[in-house]
Amino acid sequence: MYFNRKVTNKFLIAISTALIAVNLLIPVAKAQANKVTVSNLGNHFSNEVQCLAENIYYESASESFEGKLAVAQVTLNRVNSGKFPKTVCGVVKQKDEVNGRIVCQFSWFCSSAYSMIRNSYQWEESVLVAKKALTSEVSHVILHREKAMYYHANYVKPNWNLPRITQIGNHIFYKERSKI
């Protein structure tokens, strides 16, 4: 049997990449996954989905499913940290005053540009990711385990000095510095 080496190598690379991607998205056991669940959100579930979907959309609309899930995971890590508000909407809408000016945790929330959904496919995928993340159906294993709390676009140079975890798409993810 004859195999074209170039085609075979491309096929193997594609399969390897797919397996790695699937491994990153393997659901974490519900006991270990995000503490935010339908049962403890009650009537607020649809509001929490809306807030998380908006954050995913405005922070990562053009990213892959994994990139959107990564943004969702950081948001949920903050909810579960005890250092941020205890709800998704609280985390997403959090504002602080710095040197007399209002600063949002997620810059889109302080911008009027966020009022319009421009791409219905990206919005629908953002809602799907939000629902799956909130019900612990999926979790970004690496960012969940490493407790990623911050990220920025790869073209931004913040003055943070935090331990870098990884880059996913156009975002670089960080965790808080361990206390010694």
Predicted regions and their residues:
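C-terminal segment of classical bacterial N-terminal signal peptides
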Residues: 21-28
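Bacterial extracytoplasmic/cell-wall-associated proteins, especially those involved in peptidoglycan
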Residues: 2, 30-180
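Bacterial N-terminal signal peptides that target proteins for export
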Residues: 4-15
